[in-house]
């Protein structure tokens, strides 16, 4: 079994960039929770079937994919709906992460999990690497990358673990406040 290093950090911290650099330099496998979260709601999956049964057919786009904007409306206006969705998806995502880790053939595996601390998933890794940035850096990067406004980013930040909570869970820290040279 591979030695698992979890990479976590808040939105806009540069987790994916750091993971991609490690992969390029050391040819190691990456298990990415965000990618898995999208895959478990692809058309025909148990996740999407359950979501459609719960929210109704209007939660789907014409092509059968999840209408993410509609789902966001449903869960952010009603906390119990967000909890229902988390209760459905988190076990599916966790199970797939564990499956991919078990199949990893590289000496090290990077487990990229934005909400590692919030979901208490540190047990999945041998070490936790926090990609740390100042809040203003997170806001600027996310506004530029996702074309959202400052208030939307601040709302996301408020729903995530604090910088202090993440740093307390860290075995190692990368300060990523500077522009990465390629």
Swiss-Prot record:
For whether the record's keyword set contains ATP-binding, the answer is yes
Q: Which residues bind ATP?
A: 12-17
Highest taxon of the lineage: Bacteria
GO molecular function terms attached to this record: ATP binding; dephospho-CoA kinase activity
Keywords recorded for this protein, A-Z: ATP-binding, Coenzyme A biosynthesis, Cytoplasm, Kinase, Nucleotide-binding, Transferase
Q: Could you say which enzyme class this protein belongs to?
A: transferase
What Enzyme Commission number(s) appear in the record?
Answer: 2.7.1.24
Annotated metabolic or biological route of this protein: Cofactor biosynthesis; coenzyme A biosynthesis; CoA from (R)-pantothenate: step 5/5
Pfam families on file: CoaE (PF01121)
| Ranges in a coiled coil | none
- DPCK domain location is 4-182
Q: Which Gene3D superfamilies match?
A: P-loop containing nucleotide triphosphate hydrolases
One GO biological process term: coenzyme A biosynthetic process
> Cross-referenced InterPro entries, in alphabetical order?
Depp_CoAkinase, P-loop_NTPase
Q: Where in the cell is it found?
A: Cytoplasm
Q: Which catalytic reaction applies to this protein?
A: 3'-dephospho-CoA + ATP = ADP + CoA + H(+)
Entry's family note: Belongs to the CoaE family.
Q: What is this protein called?
A: Dephospho-CoA kinase
Source species of the chain: Aliivibrio fischeri (strain ATCC 700601 / ES114) (Vibrio fischeri)
């Amino acid at each position: 079994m591979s030695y698992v290093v979890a990479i976590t950090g808040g939105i806009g911290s540069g987790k994916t960039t750091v993971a991609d650099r490690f992969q390029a330099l050391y040819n190691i496998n990456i298990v990415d929770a965000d990618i898995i979260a999208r895959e478990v709601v692809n058309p025909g999956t148990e996740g999407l079937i359950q979501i459609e049964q719960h929210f109704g057919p209007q939660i789907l786009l014409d092509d059968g994919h999840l209408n993410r904007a509609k789902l966001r409306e449903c869960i952010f206006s009603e906390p119990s709906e967000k909890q229902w969705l988390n209760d459905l998806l988190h076990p599916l995502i966790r199970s797939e992460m564990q499956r991919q880790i078990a199949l990893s053939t590289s000496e090290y595996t990077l487990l990229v999990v934005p909400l590692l601390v919030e979901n208490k998933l540190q047990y999945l890794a041998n070490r936790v690497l926090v990609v740390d940035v100042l809040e203003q850096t997170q806001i600027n990067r996310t506004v530029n990358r996702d074309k959202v406004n400052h208030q939307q980013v601040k709302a996301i930040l408020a729903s995530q673990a604090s910088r202090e909570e993440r740093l307390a869970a860290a075995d190692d820290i990368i300060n990523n406040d500077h522009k990465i040279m390629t």
